[in-house]
Design a protein with these regions (language model features):
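Serine-hydrolase catalytic core recognition
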Residues: 1-201
Length: 202
């Protein structure tokens, strides 16, 4: 079982489409019984429900609050088990809630944007489209205080960085992908998206 927050539209307004939201940081807990720290997304998801969408917000593996094994499941492979949980969420929408398999999108920011891009590049055809905000595309260029606890360092473990970085899968892009990134971002560098873009469209 994967903990998640589900937003369901009223039957009379349902359009049969689904959206999966991927929270950021890679370690936050977002499926809980109090006000979401993603309050903007919380309000946006309720708006999407009013427009007929079913929205699923998953505390994928790597998220805190579910024990050591859950938290450390992404060691040496970001975009592995954490992404598999999004794919399981997609199956849940289709098999349990009768969401149209051809009308499912995925989106998120920061780590959520990274997972969005990895989903489209490593599992083409599973999602109709994705929106990736301020996304890491090459973990070797990100803050090593963050990545070294998960992927080690590029010098010591280049394999982990390569299989975890979307830029190495860019040529697989088949689906609709929107990437948005502020040029003044001092956490995830804007250059990450710039480097990925021409590779994706050559």
């Amino acid at each position: 079982d994967v903990p998640a927050r589900l937003y369901k539209p009223l039957n009379e307004v349902s359009n049969g489409a689904g959206i999966i939201f991927v929270h950021g940081a890679g370690y936050l807990q977002n499926a809980h019984n109090w006000w979401s720290s993603y309050y903007r997304e919380y309000m946006f998801h309720n708006l999407l429900c009013d427009l007929g969408f079913t929205v699923l917000d998953i505390d994928y593996r790597g998220s805190e609050g579910y024990g050591r094994d859950w938290r450390t499941a992404i060691y040496r492979h970001m975009g592995g088990w954490d992404l598999n949980d999004q794919l399981s969420g997609r199956d849940f929408l289709i098999n349990q809630l009768a969401v149209d398999s051809t009308k499912i999108g995925i989106y998120g920011g920061s780590y959520g944007g990274f997972i969005t891009i990895m989903a489209l590049l490593t599992h083409p055809g599973k999602f109709k489209s994705g929106a990736a905000l301020r996304s890491v595309t090459d973990w070797a260029h990100y803050n090593h205080e963050y990545t070294s606890n998960i992927l080690n360092t590029p010098v010591l473990d280049s394999t982990s960085f390569r299989k975890s970085s979307p830029i190495y899968f860019a040529e697989n892009l088949e689906d609709n992908l929107l990437m948005l990134h502020g040029v003044m971002d001092d956490n995830v560098q804007y250059q990450d998206v710039v480097r990925l873009s021409p590779v994706s469209y050559t």
